Amino acid sequence: MTHHRRRWLRRSVIGLGAVVVVAGGAFFTVGPGMVEKSMNKLDPGRPSEPSREARALHARLLVVDMHADTLMWDRDLLDRAVRGHVDLPRLREGGVALQVFSSVSKSPKGQNYDANTADSDNITLLTIAQLQPPRTWGSLLERSLYHAEKLEQAAKDSGGALMLIRTKADVDRLIAARRAGQDVTGALFSVEGLQNLEGQFDNVARLEAAGMRMAGFTHFFDNEVAGSMHGVDKGGLTDLGRRVFDAMEQRGIIVDLAHASHTAMDEMLRRATKPLVASHGGVQATCDVNRNLTDEEIRGVARTGGVVGVGYWDAAVCELTPKAVVDAIEHVIKVGGIETAALGSDYDGAVTVAWDTSDLAVITQELLDRGHSEEEIAAIMGGNTLRVMRAVLPD
């Protein structure tokens, strides 16, 4: 090899190495944010500004949202973000008294509402790209434990502005603080799909110790505890699932029906001795999507004393408007009673919405326009969910 060719080869290798370094740096520093920005969108068709009357009423409410996937993304909850739907500054602007933060541990490739297998996962690459601890790269349990740690650390760093909710007493303290005029926001840790148990019953206790106080049994695929509405078999509870269900009720962990198959949901509703929730979704009567609840399922939730959280994205309500959201809420009321209606946004859950958490007064405006009383609006916007939390959470 000639001296000229060796020098050319050396330069080529150095140049290729530089390209790899730059590409790798972009993957780890820019990539995760670009992915989130492309998945958690705000539709440009923003609703009209709420009236002064609606804003004044909204400020008096105890607003509760039962589902946001914010912990999945590489953002500081305490800082205002230029992407996504939820952070503490926007929660405060939206008058949110309590936000349920869910841990998403696995998402299948080609995810859809009809049928997904469990043999692929999009979250693994995301955990690596975000430079999460290596223990999370191959363990669904460790991913959820890491999400719980993120939430706990945010509360510690917030100077009291973000308060972890784990007991009935915590709920009471939050309500008292809000009514005393303190700008404090509650945060309850949930998980979306008990695939993070990794088939081990004892992991319920590990997640409980980390702060889990609500859990959906499935996400987009069948797992070791239950069939998913979007799985292949769509079966009911497994033997492990029944043990887990009973243990959750005994331990004061709220059972979430979201994403469960109709068979699994029916079994859980019949097995329940405490209120159950469907944390986020819609109703088939106003938006005929398979993940949404039938009237009989709404009645089943109501019979347990639970609540149905209505979301704001297209698959939940079919239109990105406050009207569509309140149409679904009013159907829940018609079938299950006023005490069954609640909110469950699915913010930051790879969905497009027309308003983020800072603009929740648009729902209050729509409810007001429909002639609902302040007492009814207070129940829908959060009072019903707080009642369920006080009924189920441990002392």
Per-region residue spans from a language model:
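Active-site core of metal-dependent hydrolases
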Residues: 216-219, 224-295, 309-317
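N-terminal hydrophobic targeting/anchoring segments and the immediately downstream early-domain regions
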Residues: 2-232, 288-343, 347-395
